[in-house]
Amino acid sequence: MSKIHTDLKKIDPITVQVVLGSLENVAVEMGHKLARMSYSSIIRESEDFGCALVDVRGQQLCESSHSTPLQSGPIPGYIKGIREIMEDRNDTFNQGDVIMHNSPYHGASHGPDVGFCIPVFYKDELIGFSVTTAHHLDIGSSTPGSCGIVDAVDAYAEGLQFKAIKVYDQGVKNRYVWDILKDNIRAPKLVVGDMEAQIAAARIGAQRYIEIIEKYGLDTVQAASEELMNYSEKMMRDAIKKLPDGEYTAEGFLDGYLDSDDPAKKDLRINVTVKVDGSDLTVDLTGTSPQVTDKPINMPLLGTVDIAIYLTLRSILLDSTVYGNFPQNSGLIRPIKIVAPKGTLCNPIFPAPTIARFNSGNAVADTLMKALAQVVPHQVSAGVGNLQVVAFSGQSNENYWVYMDIMEGSYGGRYGKDGMDAVDTLYANTRNNPIEDIESHYPLRVNRYELRDNDSAPGKWRGGIGSIREVSFLADGSFSVEADGHKYAPWGFDDGQDGYVGSLSIRDNETNELVQLPSKLPNRHAQSGSTIQLVGPCGGGYGNPLEREPEKVLSDYLDGFITKEKALVEYGVTITDSEEIDYEKTNELRKV
């Protein structure tokens, strides 16, 4: 069993809290400034970015509350990868350096999530790093966009690889790196603008960190930071101690490539065993399917798999509705160990591609939650509906336009609450993009955006409802899709029913024929007037549907979420022609 790290020096709790507030404010300011300065909607609207301060040992001190955990969480891994590469080169950190990094085999979550790292010096001593990460619209992969690259055959087909590249060396801009970048990506104005916003936000973080140290002293800030990490570690250990010692196993499945003739590329197993030993917890992924060598649904162990596990454990064992706000730092992960055999989906071997790893990581989180449901049933939800991520693109005046959209998933029901409808799920929390923003910037028309009709999974607490979005092309273009959950429905829990699968289709302008498409769709041409429809999965139900309050069943009917027939058959609730509950008939039905 590992032990809690000792403090650098004794420090009073009031000072610790003051330093905590100061650090958290820095991360918030970084995130706010990054969102305000960015060009692309995936950052300024969807907030698919991360900001954090990291100490000299690579431990995360704070993270931006405005960012997605899948961006902020991997930042220590970015630092670890950068240091390893620089040590191999015999390179050093210097004042004025800005380092660009996106290698998924060196800590990055995947190639499009480009990080910018600024080493922070105080009195000529390296004391830490200020880091921003963000998802970029294009990094020069084989087809337009940075999602839906589902046919990448290896890491090289996924786009440019930046392995600890100094874009500023001791304050001097390396113009040649920027020239190479601009010449090898689509939509360079947007991408480079976003990158410059990241650098500016990271510089703000570095400056504010130094200001905190100048105000309170380096020893005080370091001691307070260690105390905060010890506190977070203790919170996690105390939560783990409440679990019975033992092993808890669950399995889940990914669609994979349902249109493939190769059985090794579809129906892919995710196997999770949780091992509890006192205040230590191990997540063992042995039994997970082998890596898919020439398809990019493999997951980097460091940057995706670890973050899916850490964030799921944090949200389940330290639910913020119970514990309130507490320090988000590297102390939380000290009690947790991850085992993932090499050569599997969860620990691929280079150069296996990884760019389309999002839904795979979400499946790891979902299966981990399923395993924990055996011991903390009141702290988990039923199965979640995965996301559909779409890249739209086209050409105008010899230039590319590229737009990325995140089609929401849905949560399963949980003890005491219905599942959340049409939201990002589990290890991410990005926001949707306003329709007005889409239609004012791109030749696209959103014809329909609403919740699915009559498809909520029955349960004492029903599953969340997925959304439907129909988008028409106003000019010739193309699109690609990275999705899952078109075959395997989200699981129901404790007599709750399974959710509903998603779907993808296109109605071509010329033939007017509706064509069903697979969940992994490589770049496909779309003529002007063609319309695509994305239907998001619905989360699983929790608990026996016959125990659902009749008033909630009526409310769902009035909202259009279920039909009278479903209310009767699934919930045993009779709704009259005057849209009221017939309690006598309902009670009789439920007795049967």
From Swiss-Prot:
Among the GO biological process terms of this entry, one is: glutathione metabolic process
> EC number(s)?
3.5.2.-
Which Pfam families does the UniProt entry name for this protein?
A: Hydantoinase_B
Keyword Amino-acid biosynthesis among record annotations? yes
Its function? Involved in the asymmetric conversion of racemic 5-substituted hydantoins to the corresponding L-amino acids. HyuA and HyuB are both required for the conversion of D- and L-5-substituted hydantoins to corresponding N-carbamoyl-D- and N-carbamoyl-L-amino acids, respectively.
Question: What quaternary structure, including any partners, is listed in this protein's UniProt entry?
Answer: May form a complex with HyuA.
- Give the protein name, as stated in the record: Putative D-/L-hydantoinase subunit B
Q: Which species is listed as the source?
A: Pseudomonas sp. (strain NS671)
